């Protein structure tokens, strides 16, 4: 008895010594693959290129994780053709690369936007204030800005909500993540995160600015609710978007479409400029609709590409039963090699390419804003 409890004590001491202050995290690294690791091991995995959902907060029954628990994503009949060409073209015309440059310069001037750092909180504060300024003339019964507090870390997610006029319960979401990371030493080294993923955030900010200027201010209002999400902590295992979509699923919200923008600015070969539309772990019917938008409104083509499991925040939508899609700067193999380092800087990006991504966002929210899900 005595020996046994000594033995237990010894083991506890060993574990405590090995992982001081490090509670285990539960990671889902594949559809049927779950592992438990200390916090510091998450970084090692990322450095080796492994992507995952950190589901620690959202699973109580592990390690007996059951895939059947994941809801299936319903298929909706998205519009087979576009019907708002004039309005969309009118907005696209006004895309301002100068404004995008200014926002990205400011956003990348934070030493890092690592979600656990004070800098990461400050960058969220700047983003929230800038969004409030962009949308300040829209009355509160139409537009609200929510600071989604994650409790475990300081950098909050931001949800901009344009409430629909006739079917506000049907929700269309545009997402991007605001955090950046230096995978070498995240708490110490710089991570300007221009492409990854400041570019997605700035692409969506510009779309929000034009949506405000050319649409809402002219008295238009979408039938469905349109939301812009700026997620915290993507780099920690999609933590921010998992919190948001898990809450939406619990509240039984009806998300009819989600489009993620993440890495929108790098062009490896200007002679062969295109966007990459991600076909794995996304929702086929929605992906087809996004292709229609690209064909209708962009001056460059798309190419199908694959990005792997838990690639970006759209994965948090689909694993909660909501349709998700993802358009990235190019075919995956041609994407920016400088991400997650001090070299992910603004001078390596193309604002014209980011503007093409902004067109996708405007096309999607204006077309789906007036679409009837039934
Ligand atoms: C708010 O936006 C206007 C342009 O619409 C700009 O001139 C002004 O500097 C902005 N203010 C802040 C605090 O960002
Ligand atoms: C969309 O809203 C407008 C008014 O804002 C209304 O006239 C129209 O019937 C609505 N469309 C649908 C499909 O509900």
From Swiss-Prot:
One of its GO terms (cellular component) is fungal-type vacuole. Zn(2+) 2 binds at residues 196, 235, 340. Its EC number is 3.4.11.-. The keyword Metal-binding applies. Keywords: Aminopeptidase, Hydrolase, Metal-binding, Protease, Signal, Zinc. Binds 2 Zn(2+) ions per subunit. Its cofactor is Zn(2+). GO terms for biological process: proteolysis. The keyword Metal-binding applies. Zn(2+) 1 binds at residues 177, 196, 262. Residues 1-18 form the signal peptide. One of its GO terms (molecular function) is metalloexopeptidase activity. Pfam families: Peptidase_M28 (PF04389). Belongs to the peptidase M28 family. M28E subfamily. This is Probable aminopeptidase YDR415C. The lineage of its organism: Eukaryota, Fungi, Dikarya, Ascomycota, Saccharomycotina.
């Amino acid at each position: 008895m005595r020996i046994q409890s000594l033995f237990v004590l010894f083991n506890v001491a060993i574990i405590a010594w090995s992982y001081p202050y490090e509670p285990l995290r539960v990671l889902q690294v594949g559809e049927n693959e779950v592992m438990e690791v200390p916090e510091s091991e998450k970084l090692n995995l990322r450095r080796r290129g492994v992507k995952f959902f950190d589901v620690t907060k959202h699973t109580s029954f592990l390690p007996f994780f059951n895939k059947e628990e994941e809801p299936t994503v319903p298929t909706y009949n998205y519009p087979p053709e576009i019907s708002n060409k004039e309005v969309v073209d009118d907005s696209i015309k006004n895309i301002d690369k100068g404004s995008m440059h200014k926002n990205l310069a400011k956003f990348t001037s934070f030493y890092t936007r690592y979600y656990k750092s004070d800098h990461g909180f400050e960058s969220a504060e700047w983003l929230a204030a800038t969004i409030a300024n962009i949308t300040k003339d829209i009355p509160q019964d139409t537009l609200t800005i929510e600071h989604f507090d994650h409790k475990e870390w300081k950098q909050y997610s931001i949800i901009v909500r344009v409430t629909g006029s006739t079917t506000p319960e049907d929700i269309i979401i545009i997402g991007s993540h605001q955090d950046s990371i230096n995978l070498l030493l995240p708490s110490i080294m710089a991570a300007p995160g221009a492409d990854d993923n400041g570019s997605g955030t700035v692409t969506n900010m510009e779309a929000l600015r034009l949506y405000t200027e050319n649409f809402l201010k002219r008295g238009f209002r979408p039938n469905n609710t349109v939301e812009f999400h700026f997620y915290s902590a993507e780099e920690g295992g999609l933590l921010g978007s998992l919190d948001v979509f898990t809450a939406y699923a619990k509240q039984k919200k009806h998300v009819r479409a989600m489009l993620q923008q993440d890495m929108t600015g790098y062009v490896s070969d200007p002679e062969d400029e295109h966007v990459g539309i991600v076909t794995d772990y996304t929702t086929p019917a929605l992906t087809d609709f996004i292709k229609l938008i690209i064909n209708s409104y962009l001056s460059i083509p798309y190419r199908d590409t694959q990005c792997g499991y838990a690639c970006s925040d759209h994965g948090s939508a689909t694993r909660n039963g909501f349709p998700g899609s993802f358009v990235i700067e190019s075919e995956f193999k041609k994407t920016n090699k400088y991400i997650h380092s001090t070299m992910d800087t603004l001078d390596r990006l193309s604002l014209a390419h980011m503007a093409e991504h902004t067109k996708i966002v405007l096309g999607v929210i204006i077309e789906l804003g007036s679409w009837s899900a039934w």
